[in-house]
């Protein structure tokens, strides 16, 4: 038996059905916990921002460290996410050739708090123009 009392389902109903969320809720309630939260956005970029915002609000992450990876493929975000987690930070996603609007807004909103930022992957994953846009969003 797992002693889990809280859970977050990441993604909207297209990505994770209500049936799955309901099954998670059933397990949580049976274990004396509360129903799960659903963290999601309009797309994968906004979902990553919602996960970051909610993780910080829950006290399990901080905006002092941000990792940025392409949202067009998963390996860089998956591998980089481990490092971001070790740092107590968050991961944001972007398109390869243009900084996603949701990520840009998050960076601008938290620029004063962000002390460290890593881009996961080379220029084929996150183009130089995006790296420049990230620096501009942070005022660096």
Q: What kind of region is each of these model predictions?
A:
Residues 1-140:
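Extracellular glycan-binding segments that recognize GlcNAc-based cell-wall polysaccharides
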């Amino acid at each position: 038996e797992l002693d889990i009392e809280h859970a977050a389902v990441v993604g909207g109903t297209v990505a994770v059905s209500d049936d799955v969320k309901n099954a998670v809720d059933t397990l949580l309630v049976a274990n004396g916990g509360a129903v799960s939260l659903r963290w999601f956005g309009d797309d994968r970029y906004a979902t990553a921002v919602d996960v970051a915002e909610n993780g910080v609000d829950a006290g399990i992450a901080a905006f002092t460290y941000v990792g940025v990876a392409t949202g067009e493929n998963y390996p860089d975000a998956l591998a980089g996410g481990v490092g971001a987690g070790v740092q107590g930070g968050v991961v944001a996603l972007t398109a390869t050739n243009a900084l996603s609007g949701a990520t840009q807004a998050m960076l601008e909103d938290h620029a004063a708090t962000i002390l460290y930022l890593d881009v996961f992957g080379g220029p084929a994953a996150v183009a130089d123009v995006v790296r420049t846009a990230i620096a501009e969003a942070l005022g660096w």
